[in-house]
């Protein structure tokens, strides 16, 4: 645990780490999250898990149906003190800062399995997996930065960065095995996977320190909020048809197989940044309450301007198909021959 009454946590994620991704409507400062981080009084690490399963017998033939599930949740806090220094090739130091970083990692894992056997010939299996991870932190740094505190004569200032990376993976798999005849067998399956990578409402604020020790909000697009979303839908299919052949050894290994696999993927990424001009006047640092300056009332009063940048995006669609044929023959008692043909097609 990271003990302390003033452990900082950014606003915008619930207990399970799922984040609020809503963006403001045009010309309104109605962001869903505060610029001022929350204070967590008792940031205790904790975790818990659940598991269970059962088997049933269905119908007159008492076909077995079984399921099993396991789920876990964890939340871990950490606090670090940091020293950040950078210089150019000549040795001149342009960054010399000390800071504090308050981090929280929230994770969930869910696994599920459902299996059904029909008449001891056919089987149907469903697998589910969910992995969710939210890594968020609040970082506060004070000191010299020659690039980002140019409003200060000696390049001194304060920087607060609040960032959350919210990632989710959901996997669904359905697999079946069908014994059509004594010699003919069909395996078929499909999976649908979803990936989401979110960075909602990253908040960066810079303040420059004047020679008299007071602070002002830094200009030149040093007050910003950033949103990005990556989504992927991934569908996979496969089918194998196997016909067993008779050989002189009655090995059961000789066969011919025909199969197909396909993959269909859609990727979409979108990112946008909001920039704010500096609200004029001195800023109190104890406590630092930026919501008193950046709000909808001050925007409408003309104390600062808000600019929404151009949306950066890309989209990729992939279609992948492949087919194959394979033959296996028991040549001798301890020698098996195998030959196959594979055809691959890719369209992006």
Functional labels for PLM-detected ranges:
Residues 1-44:
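N-terminal, post-signal-peptide soluble/periplasmic segments
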Residues 31-139:
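Transmembrane beta-barrel wall of Gram-negative outer-membrane proteins
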Residues 81-93, 140-154, 202-212, 272-282:
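Flexible, surface-exposed loop regions and adjacent strand-edge segments
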Residues 1-19, 101, 158-163, 255, ...:
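Short intrinsically disordered, low-complexity coil segments enriched in acidic
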Residues 1-18, 72-84, 133-137, 195-207, ...:
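Short, solvent-exposed beta-strand-terminating loops
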Residues 57-64, 144-153, 246-251:
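Intrinsically disordered, low-complexity coil segments
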Residues 26-45, 93-109, 157-170, 222-234, ...:
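Outer-membrane beta-barrel proteins
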Residues 115-133, 161-348:
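Face-selective signature of the C-terminal outer-membrane beta-barrel domain
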